[in-house]
Amino acid sequence: MKSYDVIIVGGGPAGLAAAISAKKEGIDSILIIERDNQLGGILNQCIHNGFGLHTFKEELTGPEYADRFIQQAAELNIEYKLHTMVCDISHDKVVTVMNREDGMVMYQAKAVVLAMGCRERPRGALNIPGYRPAGIYSAGTAQRLVNIEGFMPGKKVVILGSGDIGLIMARRMTFEGAKVQCVAEVMPYSGGLKRNIVQCLDDYDIPLYLSHTVIDIEGRDRLTGVVIAEVGPDRKPIPGTEMHYDCDTLLLRSEERRVGKECRSRWSPYH
């Protein structure tokens, strides 16, 4: 069984930064395990600029920012495996992984770093009534479809949730020729940066409805429209405030859930 001082699960920005820092502290035997086909994680689909101002003192796109870390990891000869899924981590830090080239392999680690990022909450967690037609995506999924896969989810879009990715996707869909009808936010304030509200919504005359949510989804095979309504302090819809929008695409931007949040851990007073 091959051994490593540190095994890092996840090759996104956090995993790369952890590996680079560990290497600079004198730890030689490091392995990054990434299930995707490239390092960089979520940064690869964030093609807008605004990254790198604090770390590199210049404005970069997401892929450019990721590439800086990938180059540093390469210069430090940090080992990594792509297309590799972690199946199990035992109490004695034996990491079991699987990929097409090696099959199932076990590695012994002295320390394991979990840097697996976050996952968007699905529609089912948002309690939106209606059928399940095609055309409903998380904002992150739509971002990957447009920026990496080269597919347009639809032509008439409503976005629920005003986090930064939701705001950025409103602008991105507009760039690609879609009509973004509105952005609705259940909270009385936006979850995104003021800069993104101005640059992604105000500059393109996209309305932002605070204290509003989607209360109905229309369509059987394909989404045909949504109904949004104002909500009170209890987040319940206020009768008489309903607005109908024809659309073929609904993007959901909700609170992210950390991957591995339920991993059991035990505090050690010696570390």
Say what each PLM segment does.
Residues 260-271:
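Positively charged, low-complexity/disordered segments
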